[in-house]
């Protein structure tokens, strides 16, 4: 898990990917990084 995901933030998917180093996505309230 990288960081919390907020559905109200339209840039959240990008922030999640960036936080994961380019490979991650929001799953519910969590940003999950793909190994």
UniProtKB/Swiss-Prot annotation:
Keywords: Chloride channel impairing toxin, Disulfide bond, Ion channel impairing toxin, Knottin, Secreted, Toxin, Voltage-gated chloride channel impairing toxin. It comes from the Eukaryota. One of its GO terms (molecular function) is toxin activity. SUPFAM superfamilies: Scorpion toxin-like. It holds the Pfam family Toxin_5. Disulfide bonds join 2-19, 5-26, 16-31, 20-33. Expressed by the venom gland. InterPro entries: Scorpion_toxin-like_sf (IPR036574), Scorpion_toxinS_Cl_inh (IPR007958). It is found in: Secreted. One of its GO terms (cellular component) is extracellular region. The protein sequence was deduced by comparison to other short insectotoxin sequences. Toxin with unknown function in healthy organisms. On glioma cells, interacts with chloride channels (probably ClC-3/CLCN3) and MMP2 at the surface of glioma cells. This complex is then internalized via caveolae, thus inhibiting the chloride channels necessary for cell shrinkage and tumor propagation. Belongs to the short scorpion toxin superfamily. Chloride channel inhibitor family. The presence of a 'disulfide through disulfide knot' structurally defines this protein as a knottin. This is Insectotoxin-I4.
